[in-house]
Amino acid sequence: MKKLWTDLHSNIHHNQMDELDKWVEHAKAVLDFWPIAYYPFQMIKTESGAGLEDLCPAEEIEKDWELVREKVKEVNAEGYPMFMGYEWQGCGFDGDHNVFFLDNDQPMKHPMRYEELKKEYENTEAIAIPHHVAYQLKSRGKNWATHDEEFSPFAEIFSSHGCSENDTGMMDMERHLHMGPRTGETCYERGLEAGLRVGCIASGDNHKVPAVYDHGSMCVLAENNSKEAIWEAMKARRVYGVSRSRMDIDFTVDGKPMGSVVPAGKHELKFSVKAADAIDRVEILKNNILDEMAVHSGTWETRKIGDEEVIRVKFAAEFGWGPNPRFYKDMLVREWDGSLTVPGRLVSIEKAWNSYGQKLYDVTENSCKFHMTTYMSTANGQ
């Protein structure tokens, strides 16, 4: 199977629709496929003066949705697998979900409850993927009691909001304080404890630039890169997520791929992991508890490299002046042109991009050229 990468959570707003082409071109440069998630909400002021997020006017939403439809059809005709989608929040009682469609013919619906949303798209190839699930119940955290495995085959548990796997892990959810801290009541582990078969991914929840490297991304194990094959893989939960750099992960139980259902009992588990940096360990959880651990640290650090031995080396190149705005206050944008040549062979190049204005070109077996743009403040907050 092919490993195809995407950002499943790129929210383009009404006031950004004139940038739609820019969003699409950036996504095509870094992603194997792209489900766009139109964001039909705006901030309004209540009578008390407090800010409140509500739906945009219906005519604006409808106009934008047709622009998205037209663009997706155009990109599909060019051979790139792009999906139509939008964010649904309802009344907040069931959690936020991104709704995606296999075809490009569906309307956008805004019912108040998750079960109503599911009914709206009965007999339609549609999925609704919950995100930042660990916020408070009835305050945009996930309501696992209403969850449907077929309609929502997996959940987004890491993004720019932080990590929703549980409420005790090292990756917190303190970036958006107005949405509250994460809770154990609604986190991903509660869904598993309820017996739900739900996969997990990471994706950005990006509102300025799609596919922000530092906000996570999703991998799909598909037969090929057609929309139909990708859709089948997502429905079958052959998905995983990474919080930053991409990882090549293979995982089977009795030869069945991730996302499969096997009966309880004794089984053979096999996995293979290739990462962008040294792997410390692989943890195997059972019933949300650490059951086994494969420790890699200490198995390679002291091994001597032979004089004639050929090795693979991976390194990161970073440009800019750092996240501190006290320095070079007037230099909002900086452009960099460079090249890289190695004595051996370039095995692969990962585009670790957080903003627009990046280009990789003239890539050969042992060299490449690049144009990078750095900003005083990027989409990842740095």
Predicted regions and their residues:
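Extended, charged catalytic domains and RNA/DNA-binding interfaces, predominantly
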Residues: 1-382
